A protein has these predicted regions:
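Amphipathic alpha-helical "coupling" segments that flank catalytic cores
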Residues: 1-237
Length: 237
């Protein structure tokens, strides 16, 4: 499906579908089938969204954060809950270098992965980060935290925008530095033929975050503050 957005209000209210065959009814049957599939998916999304919102309003995001203990980050690196603890500490340590409030950066890092435990993101993984920003807004968290939920994965590629909000930058740097150091420790390094954990992208993300925001960060110190046992000299060579 190709979404069509109304330029006046920004809403997606149409879609385009493509078929490689002609039909006697000028595609009416194909269109009806696609409408049925799309309606079912959107109905599922609405159901999961409403369930998530009820849970967030009743319990906040703490239940999701704790349930990340059951979500594996990597079988040699523990759970997403353990990773969240590392990100919170590292974000707080990095914050002064990027002009962010350390306590706010730490709080943001504690919730940016919470939506991984939500029903909607479980069914629609591409929405991770975006849904975290919505849920944190519902919880009444600081707006900078909501922005960080959506932006901490960025930049995802050369054409992706780099976050500029200080808290977002702190958490985004921590996310990428933790990924680099942790996978280096277990000797899962990229090669000329493969990079299954997108470590090159993470490294380029660190560089872009610093250069495009005109920031300076002692990387040796950042690596040593990250995953236990990381060899900062090996990472920088």
């Amino acid at each position: 499906f190709f979404s069509v957005r109304d330029p006046k209000n920004g809403r997606i209210d149409r879609f385009i579908t493509v078929a490689n065959q002609e039909t006697k009814d000028d595609g009416a049957t194909i269109l009806a089938g696609n409408k049925k599939v799309l309606f079912a998916r959107l109905s599922d999304a609405k159901f999961f969204w409403e369930n998530d919102v009820r849970m967030v309003r009743a319990e906040g995001m703490a239940l999701w954060i704790n349930s990340l203990a059951k979500v594996t980050f990597h079988n040699k690196l523990g759970s997403e809950r353990e990773r969240v603890e590392r990100l919170a500490k590292l974000s707080k340590d990095i914050a002064p270098y990027v002009h962010a409030d350390p306590e706010l950066a730490e709080q943001a890092a504690m919730v940016v992965k919470a939506d991984l435990a939500s029903q909607l993101v479980y069914e629609f993984p591409d929405l991770q980060g975006l849904m975290g920003s919505y849920y944190s807004n519902i919880c009444g968290l600081n707006p900078e935290i909501s922005v960080a939920c959506q932006e901490h994965y960025a930049p995802l590629g050369p054409s992706d925008k780099v976050p500029t909000a200080p808290v977002s930058v702190a958490v985004a740097l921590a996310e990428k530095i933790d990924k680099l150091t942790s996978f280096w420790v277990i000797d899962e390094k990229p090669t000329g033929r493969k990079d299954p954990f997108a470590l090159r992208r993470a490294a380029l993300g660190v560089v872009r975050l610093l250069l495009e925001n005109e920031l300076r960060l002692p990387l040796r110190d950042a690596f040593s503050m990250s995953y236990p046992g990381a060899d900062q000299d090996n990472l920088l060579n």
